[in-house]
Amino acid sequence: AYERAEEIGFPILLRPSFVLGGRGMFIVYDMDEMKKIVREVFDVAPGTPVLLDKFLEDAYELDVDCISDGERTVIGGMLQHVEFAGVHSGDAAMVMPPHTLSDEMLETVRQASYALAKELEVVGLMNVQYAIKDDELYIIEVNPRASRTIPFVSKAIGVPLAKLASRIMAGEKLKDLGFTKEIIPPYWAVKESVFPFNRFPGAPIMLSPEMRSTGEVMGLDKNIGVAFAKSQMAAKPALPDSGDVFISVKDADKERAVQIAKGLSALGFGVLATVGTGKLFKKNGIDVKNVCRLSEGRPNVIDLIKNNKVSLIINTPQGTVPRQNENEIRTEAMKHNICIMTTISAASAAVDGLSLIHISEPTRLTSI
């Protein structure tokens, strides 16, 4: 396995040969980390095959739900993940229709989905998970069955896909059922996952290849930022409209974190950051207050959380396993019902939503 990992090149996705819900999956960034995980996890069951895949870092991920009668295939919905690839599809926030992909790429996705359904002779539902990196399309997996996104897609387009699929499997055709072309909803539909972290104090609060969510909510609006903000209000502590924001991100996220901090500052939020991130913010003209790391002294961010001095936390993990300090911060935030973003993509979408809510009319209802 170590030799194959060197051949494939890091980062890699390391997992048991058969898993459900991403159980036992790890994104591994170097050989030392891989050896540690293999010793701690896979040596428990010697002889169990281990699968290694090249991990496409910073790739966009897309879920496509289709229905086919064996002759005609219709796409029920295409959902773009808010987070980059690496977060389990059951945990990822998703936007329907896709919001950043080109029309050309979406057409490529459609044709690939039609071809897969035809070659696999699908009669019923099919889900395909794609990754897109550098304008190249990759197939992650194909499941000739109903996926967990079917209820969401059905509600978004107003078509009971599971009901249609059962009738198709009994011999009826899409033409007879009146569903012959893809429906693009006239609004944005955002799926956000609901997590049970407040029920399990001390559990790692981090999005990863292993699924942790126990439910989901839907945000609808004519504006994508507002739709995302609505989903956050329903799924977790609501996005704040004022206060101080603590930002601590890994090196790969710092460029985008600058734009996020600028956006929050323009909305009247105070910006808090550790020394390294704070220097970068100051260099870019952002007014920032430095906060001690947990190992550097006090007051640190946990002190501020306990004293209700923080209203939003943006904290992205470094590598596969969060450092102990990072986990303590996220755990304390959950205890105090503070909204926390653990991926830079989600943080960016949240800022967009806050910006629009600040300048728009009161939150409106969207009919489906």
Ranges and model annotations:
Residues 125, 133, 146-151, 155-164, ...:
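Acidic, glycine-enriched active-site microenvironments
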Residues 8-11, 21-23, 27-241:
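ATP-dependent carboxylate activation and anion-phosphoryl transfer catalytic cores
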Residues 357-368:
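Single conserved hydrophobic/aromatic residue that forms the stacking wall/gate
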Residues 1-25, 286-293, 345-353:
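A conserved helix-loop-beta module that forms one wall/lid of the active-site cleft
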Residues 1, 64, 113, 329, ...:
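Aromatic/hydrophobic pocket-lining residues that form π-stacking "cages" and hydrophobic walls in ligand
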